Regions:
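Short helix-initiation/N-cap motifs at beta->coil->alpha
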Residues: 113-122, 216-222, 293-307
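Short, solvent-exposed loop/beta-turn-alpha elements that line the ligand-binding surface or hinge
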Residues: 155-167, 212-215, 256-276, 329, ...
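A structural signal for short loop-to-beta-strand junctions that line the ligand-binding cleft
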Residues: 67, 124-126, 133-134, 138-139, ...
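Extracytoplasmic/periplasmic solute-binding protein
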Residues: 77-79, 177-188, 192-194, 219-266
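Extracytoplasmic/periplasmic substrate-recognition and gating elements
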Residues: 328-398
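Conserved N-terminal structural module of periplasmic/extracytoplasmic solute-binding proteins
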Residues: 9, 23-144, 148, 367, ...
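Sec-dependent N-terminal signal peptides of Gram-positive bacterial secreted proteins and lipoproteins
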Residues: 4-26
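Glycine-centered hinge/linker elements that transmit conformational signals in sensory
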Residues: 225-227, 262-297
Length: 475
């Protein structure tokens, strides 16, 4: 779902709402109120129509031969505000999964474009109108789309005993609700990372965060200590930038605000580990370590990293999974740009990591559920096959300007995300509850007192959780 994240990041740079100033994949920022005219970034490049090399074509053909089944209906309909299946002007190229879908099944994905703000209303219109939309982004669809009847289980269309689906069964079971799978998780993908500039680190006497990570010393405490030493607004030295800060940091505790346990939705607002994570963010704000975007027209200042004025920026790998003509404009000279995992919470029992999932939902009334299932298998295969991974790596180097060192760190982030993934699903709660939680968990990093905030929302959140569980059980 990297294209979605890239779009969200671009849009959030344009908003001025204070409530959007902190969280990531489950935070207020990503759940912002986006306008139709804000659905593209300002800087674009020519669409990359380059085809695979002959050797890569052969590798794709071999992988396609390993897939099973036939597909009578070759068209699947995708509803979203972004298109991850085709090359676009944002610098991304056609994914290996789509190469497989075309090669094996002669399949095609028909893109029904919507906006972030209108995606669920458009989905409802299409479902009720019998358009036969097949699938849509799933990051915030469970449980609300289960309750509203906009999605359906995909269990009848896949074989959990097959090697492909067995390889992702555990992560899919994380989101199993009322005995069925509604969230089609094809893979746990790399979560958010910390970007920095090596030249800035060296000039300020800091050890390279990559070396700290390799020694097991890259912790939340070390992260805060480095910010404390660097930040000096009078000298134009700023700390942590980015719209997506709070969620990756609090998920390092291993506890999301809302989760699914034993097939039911559960609130963790009162959990002591969640409390610890919130108070850590209060400390970051209290010490002036978060870039005050109100001083910059509510815009991130990523270019400050390259200029030596900013220490850290939290974002997804999508930030540099695009043409270097785009990302070098914001991050600086490519040899100085690097990233490391979100720091480890040394008080947690494991190195928990904010998880991104390549995941989708099967629409109610889908005209081609079998086609969606086969496409999902192409996606899973593209993540697990060594040749497909190598093709992806070559794309990163040739199309995105990545180095082998970047690819190695990407694999390390993937390992952390796969071993101990944590995902907050409060965005899938009813909109009023989602907004309440979003505003609440943004407060500490903006200077709010977590204890008073928590007291003000606990009763409402608990009631909503009970109502959601009752509604799911009644389906």
């Amino acid at each position: 779902m990297t294209k979605m994240k890239r779009t969200c990041a671009a849009l959030l740079a344009m908003t001025t709402a204070v409530s959007l100033a902190g969280c990531a994949s489950s935070g207020g920022g990503e759940h912002g109120y986006l306008l139709e005219q804000e659905t593209t970034t300002a800087l674009t490049v020519a669409i990359n129509t380059e085809t695979l090399a002959p050797e890569q074509e052969e590798q794709v053909a071999d992988l396609a031969d390993s897939l099973t089944g036939e597909l009578e209906n070759k068209n699947v309909k995708w509803l979203s505000f972004y298109d991850p299946w085709h090359a676009t002007t944002q610098g991304n190229t056609k994914p290996v999964s789509m190469e497989l879908f075309e090669k094996k099944y002669g399949g095609e994905v028909e893109y029904y474009q919507t906006t972030w703000a209108n995606q669920y209303s458009d989905l409802s219109t299409f479902v009720l109108g019998g358009e036969g939309i097949d699938f849509f982004p799933a990051s915030e669809a469970v449980p609300k789309c289960v309750i509203s009847g906009m999605t359906q289980p995909y269990d009848p269309y896949i074989d959990w005993s097959s090697p492909l689906w067995e390889s992702v069964s555990e992560v899919n079971d994380m989101f199993k609700i009322a005995g069925s799978h509604y969230l089609m998780v094809c893979q746990t993908t790399e979560g958010y990372v910390v970007y920095y500039n090596r030249k800035v680190m060296e000039e300020n006497g800091f050890e390279d965060p990559k070396e700290l990570y390799e020694k097991g010393e890259w912790t939340l405490t070390k992260f805060k200590d480095m910010l404390l030493e660097f930040v000096d607004p009078e000298a134009e030295h700023y700390g942590l930038d980015g719209w997506f800060n709070c969620t990756p940091l609090y998920l390092a505790s291993g506890v999301p605000s809302i989760s699914i346990s034993d097939g039911k939705v559960k609130s963790n607002i009162m959990d002591p580990d969640f409390e610890r994570a919130m108070t850590y963010q209060s400390e970051l704000n209290r010490n002036g370590l978060i870039l005050d975007k109100s001083l910059f027209d509510w815009k991130t200042q990523i270019q400050y990293i390259g200029e030596g004025k900013e220490l850290f920026y939290i974002g997804g790998l999508y930030e540099i999974e695009q043409s270097p003509d785009i990302w070098t404009v914001t991050f600086g000279e490519p040899e100085d740009v690097f990233f490391v995992p979100i720091p480890r919470d040394e008080d947690a029992d494991k190195y928990y990591y904010n998880a991104e999932f390549d995941c989708y939902n099967l629409c109610k009334g889908a005209q081609n559920p079998e086609g969606v299932a086969r496409l999902m298998e192409c996606v899973i295969a593209s993540y697990s096959d060594e040749n497909a991974i190598e093709i992806s790596n070559e794309k990163h180097k040739n199309d995105f300007g990545w180095t082998d060192e970047m690819l190695e760190m990407k694999r390390e982030v993937k390992r952390l995300t796969t071993e101990n993934p944590v995902r907050d699903i409060y965005g899938g709660m009813p909109s009023e509850t989602s907004s309440i939680i979003s505003d609440a968990i943004n407060q500490p990093i903006q200077g709010g007192d977590w204890y008073s905030v928590r007291e003000s929302i606990t009763e409402a959140v608990d009631l909503s959780v009970q109502e959601v569980n009752d509604a799911v059980a009644a389906q």
